């Protein structure tokens, strides 16, 4: 950027800071408006008149301050550069006395065309030539400075000749005010005059042997080691026909030299301002300036643009300076592309820490491996292969020994040995297949014996029955004869593990209508009385119980045996020596509890059985309360009734801790019975006697508005006159 633009930006930032100090800063429009007035050289009175609407009582104070700053910029001193104090930032230039009125207010221009102001220094040996490019714009060196926090740190920029100036020469001394808020970088830029499209202010310095020095006090040099300090020194080259510029930026040196080799002209400074481009100016205040190096000997070179990042650190270059000198006939400059500036103000922008935190959390969620708990597999039993020896055949074989043992007739006893042999020969197959057996309930009902498996003789004499379940009786066992074979053990194991009473029924056998009965006795305490009828109780006391032929259950072995029971049963069958531990059987009997009925316990919450109660005790609260339609039969918890046992509401949805007394239904209001003769009360509808024995018809709820022609209720015949008939009108006098 040009030095004029930098000065204008500093003036604008100072104006903005002053407005904030006065409490009059609202947005960027007011500083831009003030800069336009400064560019148009408004007087103090005109500024006071124009700004009184915005600043109010602070208008005069602000305009006095602003014009004081502008007067300081116009002040001319004759002090030589060698006598200047190190704590002041001074920019010296040799100009004629008739054109020494250099104002920072002239830096900003409105979009309207304003003739450029050229301030030139004239010396006897001056030549009117300028450093320019042949085809494209060239920019001079951007010098970046960082100021210390110390109040005594200043930057002194001096343009001085190598010889003492003449007494007649005028010097422009630019000293910043304490409240100018000049704490940003100072950039020097030389731009191509041929490419100008805006009103500019050009400052031209002429000298035979000039040099530009940037001086910094030793204290600030020691304090700021990471700051890039630059000194631009200009001196003529041995060949006066061509020019060259050189800049080296080093972080460890106090000053570095860049060379400009054309003696007639030192530099050309241009500044433009337009309020319509303030977005670009704001962008300049955020971004660091583009940094370029260029050496112009007889030939030109391609120069890489150097730029600064936001944190002030300089990006490293890819190649050394010495390799940049080429033998090209033209100059190619690559301008730095400014970074995109967000349109929102900083106060409305998203916090960078929140964005970084969200990015880190997203990366953690992607990289983190979630350990999912293994889904427990269901206990499944392998199903026996579907062969001609089907499941019903295996089940019949399993109960064959049990059915043969309790024989009554002698022919059955003769066949008993044969059945035992058959059961023993097939015991291994039973043990192998029973652990994998899953019998469908329908197969139990429709079980038939296969003729391929049994011969006709065994079919005639063998008692083939299927297992059925009548009612859950936990303490009943089948008492069988002492001689038991493997088939009997199988049936007994099934009966003990299931905990239910197993009974059998005959298949349809036309040649044998009378089937032998299977005698069952009770071992231990009889079943609860509620589970059997009176006849069954009498049979239990006698020690015998008939077989219920008609109670056919739809439940098969799958309903009787759970997977755990089938596993234990298979282990017991595979253990013919009887070494199967009784502890496992005990654990099974303990684990096997009757399933609770899906009916709410009427004694809850005062039930004494606790968890052993077969009825349901609510645990979780009811979500439909108080609109629950189940009332006290709901399987979920309802709040307690505050009346408890005294509650007389039959359908009270609340919970009652103790049982309520039998709720007496409220007596219906006794309506007077109509008389037997049905005579209408003569005073109706004006009768006021509550126990009038005569008939009083019931009034229709719609009264005279009823539209049903067949309505059986009473409708008064005397109607109320219309509204207009009820209006009183004063009678007219007969005068």
UniProtKB/Swiss-Prot annotation:
Residue numbers of Phosphoserine PTMs: 85, 240, 309, 327, 343, 390, 409, 498, 515, 527, 620
Location of this chain's protein in the cell: Nucleus speckle
Positions of the UniProt region annotated as Disordered: 78-153, 308-351, 399-431
Disulphide bond pairs: none
Chain ranges of zinc fingers (C3H1-type): 595-620, 621-640, 641-656, 681-698, 700-718
Biased composition (Basic and acidic residues): 412-421
Gene3D superfamilies named in the record: 4.10.1000.30, 4.10.1000.40, PWI domain (1.20.1390.10)
GO molecular function ontology, one term from the record: poly(A) binding
Biased segments, Polar residues type: 131-144, 422-431
Modified residues (N6-acetyllysine): 357
Keyword Repeat applies: yes
GO cellular component, one term: dendrite cytoplasm
Residues with N-acetylmethionine modification: 1
Purpose of the protein: RNA-binding protein involved in the biogenesis of circular RNAs (circRNAs), which are produced by back-splicing circularization of pre-mRNAs. Acts by binding to both exon-intron boundary and 3'-UTR of pre-mRNAs to promote circRNA biogenesis through dimerization and the association with the spliceosome. Required for spermatogenesis via involvement in circRNA biogenesis. Regulates the pre-mRNA processing of ATP5MC1; preventing its degradation. Also binds the poly(A) tail of mRNAs; controlling poly(A) length in neuronal cells.
Quaternary organization: Homodimer; facilitating circular RNAs (circRNAs) formation. Associates with the spliceosome. Interacts with HOOK2. Interacts with ZFC3H1 in a RNase-sensitive manner.
Entry's family note: Belongs to the ZC3H14 family.
Protein name, per record: Zinc finger CCCH domain-containing protein 14
Record organism: Mus musculus (Mouse)
């Amino acid at each position: 950027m040009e030095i004029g633009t930098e000065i204008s930006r500093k003036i604008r930032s100072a104006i903005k800071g002053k407005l904030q100090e006065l409490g009059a800063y609202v947005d960027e429009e007011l500083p831009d408006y003030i800069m336009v007035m400064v560019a148009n050289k408004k007087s103090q009175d005109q500024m006071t008149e124009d700004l009184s609407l915005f600043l109010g009582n602070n208008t005069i104070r602000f305009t006095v301050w602003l014009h004081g700053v502008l007067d300081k910029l116009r002040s001319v001193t004759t002090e030589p550069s060698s006598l200047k104090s190190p704590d002041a930032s001074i920019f010296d230039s040799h100009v004629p006395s008739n054109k020494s009125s250099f104002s920072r207010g002239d830096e900003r221009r409105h979009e309207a065309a304003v003739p450029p102001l050229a301030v030139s220094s004239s010396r006897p040996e001056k030549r009117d030539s300028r450093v320019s490019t042949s085809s494209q714009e060239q920019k001079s060196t951007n010098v970046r400075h960082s100021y210390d926090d110390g109040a005594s740190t200043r930057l002194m920029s001096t343009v001085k000749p190598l010889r003492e100036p003449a007494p007649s020469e005028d010097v422009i001394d630019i000293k910043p005010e304490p409240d100018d808020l000049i704490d940003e970088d100072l950039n020097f830029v030389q731009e191509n005059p041929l490419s100008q499209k805006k009103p500019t202010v050009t400052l031209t310095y002429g000298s035979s042997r000039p040099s530009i020095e940037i001086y910094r006090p030793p204290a600030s040099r020691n304090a700021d080691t990471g700051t890039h300090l630059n000194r631009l020194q200009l001196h003529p080259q041995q060949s006066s026909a061509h020019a060259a510029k050189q800049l080296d930026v080093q972080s460890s040196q106090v000053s570095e030299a860049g060379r400009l080799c054309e003696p007639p002209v030192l530099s050309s400074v241009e500044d433009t301002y337009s309020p319509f481009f303030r977005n670009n100016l704001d962008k300049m205040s955020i971004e660091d300036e583009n940094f370029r190096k260029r050496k112009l000997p007889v030939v030109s070179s391609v120069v890489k643009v150097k730029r600064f990042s936001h944190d002030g650190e300089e990006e490293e270059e890819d190649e050394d300076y010495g390799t940049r000198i080429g033998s090209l006939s033209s100059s190619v400059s690559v301008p730095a592309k400014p970074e995109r500036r967000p349109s929102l103000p900083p106060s409305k922008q998203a916090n960078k820490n929140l964005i970084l935190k969200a990015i880190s959390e997203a990366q953690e969620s992607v990289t983190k491996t979630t350990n999912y708990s293994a889904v427990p597999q269901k206990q499944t039993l392998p199903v026996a292969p579907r062969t001609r020896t089907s499941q019903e055949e295996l089940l019949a074989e399993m109960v064959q020994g049990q059915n043969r043992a309790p024989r009554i007739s002698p022919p059955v006893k003769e066949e008993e040995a044969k059945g035992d042999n058959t059961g023993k020969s097939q015991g291994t197959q039973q043990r192998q297949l029973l652990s994998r057996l899953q019998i469908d309930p329908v197969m139990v009902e429709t079980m038939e014996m296969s003729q391929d498996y049994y011969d006709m003789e065994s079919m005639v004499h063998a008692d083939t029955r299927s297992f059925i379940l009548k009612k859950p009786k936990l303490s009943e066992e089948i008492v069988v004869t002492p001689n038991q074979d493997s088939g009997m053990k199988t049936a007994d194991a099934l009966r003990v593990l299931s905990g239910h009473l197993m009974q059998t029924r005959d298949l349809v056998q036309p040649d044998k209508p009378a089937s032998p009965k299977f005698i069952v006795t009770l071992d231990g305490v009889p079943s609860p009385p509620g589970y059997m009828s009176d006849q069954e109780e009498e049979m239990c006391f006698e020690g015998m119980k008939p077989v219920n032929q008609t109670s056919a259950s739809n439940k098969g072995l799958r309903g009787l045996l759970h997977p755990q029971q089938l596993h234990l049963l298979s282990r017991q069958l595979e253990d013919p020596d009887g070494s199967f531990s009784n502890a496992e059987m005990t654990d099974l009997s303990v684990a096997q509890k009757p399933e609770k009925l899906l009916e709410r316990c009427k004694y809850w919450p005062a039930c004494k059985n606790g968890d052993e109660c077969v009825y349901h005790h609510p645990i979780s609260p009811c979500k439909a309360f108080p609109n629950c339609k189940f009332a006290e039969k709901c399987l979920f918890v309802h709040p307690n009734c505050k009346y408890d046992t005294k509650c007389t509401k039959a359908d009270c949805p609340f919970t009652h801790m103790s049982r309520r007394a039998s709720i007496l239904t409220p007596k219906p209001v006794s309506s007077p019975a109509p008389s037997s003769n049905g005579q209408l009360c003569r005073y109706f509808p004006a009768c006021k006697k509550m126990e009038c024995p005569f008939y009083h018809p019931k009034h229709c709820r719609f009264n005279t508005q009823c539209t049903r022609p067949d309505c059986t209720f009473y409708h008064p015949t005397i109607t109320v006159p219309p509204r207009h008939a009820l209006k009183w009108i004063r009678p007219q006098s007969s005068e």
